[in-house]
Amino acid sequence: MLSFLSSNLSSTRQSMAQVLNFALVLSTAFMLWKGLSVFTASSSPIVVVLSGSMEPAFQRGDLLFLWNRSPRAELGEIVVYNVRGKDIPIVHRVVRTFPQIEGKAKKVKEVNEASSVPPNMLLTKGDNNIADDTELYAKNQDFLHREEDIVGSVRGYMPMVGYVTIMLSEHPWLKTVLLGIMGLMVILQREQ
C-alpha cells in the first residue's frame, strides 16, 4: 500500500512539474511580447504580410518588425496600419503626407514654407496596387492619422517565416493536427 502511495505521489509531482513548466513557458512568451511592445511603442511589434499588395518589396508570409517611436511618418516610409473597426494589419507605403492645422488636413500648397507643423495625416498605397488606399479606409475617412491609425513603421523583416501563421488561419484542420501531434509527444515523453 505504501509503495502505491509513493508511486502515485511521484506521478502527481511529475504532472505538477510539467504544468508549472508549461505555465512558465507561456508567461515568459507573454512577458517577452509585452516587453517588445513597450520597447517599440507598438501594440503589435511583429506582423505577418497577408497579401501581395507590397510585392516586390515584401512577399506574402514575410515577418515584419515594427518601430513606432517616430513622431511622424516620412514620404516613402512603409507603415502598418489598422482600419478603424477592423483588426487586420495592412502593410503599405506612405505616398503623401498632409500637415494638420486646426484639426483639418491641409494640402501642402496651403501651408507656408515657414510653418513647422509636423505632417500628421497620411495617404498610403500598396506598391503592387494601382490606386491609393482611400477605398480601404473607414467610412468618411480620407487619410490615416499618424497617432491613431498607425501600428508602426517597418524596420526589418524575415522572408517567409510568417507563412506558418497564414497556413494555420487558412486551414483550421491544420491546427487540430498540430495540437494532436503535440499532445501525442507529451504522452510519449511521459512514458519514458
Curated annotation (Swiss-Prot):
Annotated catalytic residues: 53, 92, 133
Source organism of this protein record: Aspergillus fumigatus (strain ATCC MYA-4609 / CBS 101355 / FGSC A1100 / Af293) (Neosartorya fumigata)
Membrane-side (Cytoplasmic) residue stretches: 1-18
GO molecular function per UniProt: peptidase activity; serine-type endopeptidase activity
Free-text function comment from the UniProt entry: Catalytic component of the signal peptidase complex (SPC) which catalyzes the cleavage of N-terminal signal sequences from nascent proteins as they are translocated into the lumen of the endoplasmic reticulum. Specifically cleaves N-terminal signal peptides that contain a hydrophobic alpha-helix (h-region) shorter than 18-20 amino acids.
Keyword NADP: no
Catalytic reaction(s) noted: Cleavage of hydrophobic, N-terminal signal or leader sequences from secreted and periplasmic proteins
Bilayer-spanning residue ranges: 19-39
Membrane topology type: Single-pass type II membrane protein
Residue ranges, Lumenal side: 40-192
Broad class of the protein's primary localization: endoplasmic reticulum
Protein family: Belongs to the peptidase S26B family.
Keywords: Endoplasmic reticulum, Hydrolase, Membrane, Protease, Signal-anchor, Transmembrane, Transmembrane helix
Protein name per UniProt: Signal peptidase complex catalytic subunit sec11
Quaternary assembly: Component of the signal peptidase complex (SPC) composed of a catalytic subunit SEC11 and three accessory subunits SPC1, SPC2 and SPC3. The complex induces a local thinning of the ER membrane which is used to measure the length of the signal peptide (SP) h-region of protein substrates. This ensures the selectivity of the complex towards h-regions shorter than 18-20 amino acids. SPC associates with the translocon complex.
Annotated EC: 3.4.21.89
Cellular compartments per GO CC: signal peptidase complex
Annotated spans, C-terminal short (CTS) helix: 177-188
BP terms from Gene Ontology: protein targeting to ER; signal peptide processing
SUPFAM superfamilies given in the database record: LexA/Signal peptidase
InterPro entries associated with the record: LexA/Signal_pep-like_sf, Pept_S26A_signal_pept_1_Ser-AS, Peptidase_S26, Peptidase_S26B
rRNA-binding as UniProt keyword: no
PROSITE patterns: SPASE_I_1 (PS00501)
Compartments in which it is found: Endoplasmic reticulum membrane
Recorded domain comment: The C-terminal short (CTS) helix is essential for catalytic activity. It may be accommodated as a transmembrane helix in the thinned membrane environment of the complex, similarly to the signal peptide in the complex substrates.
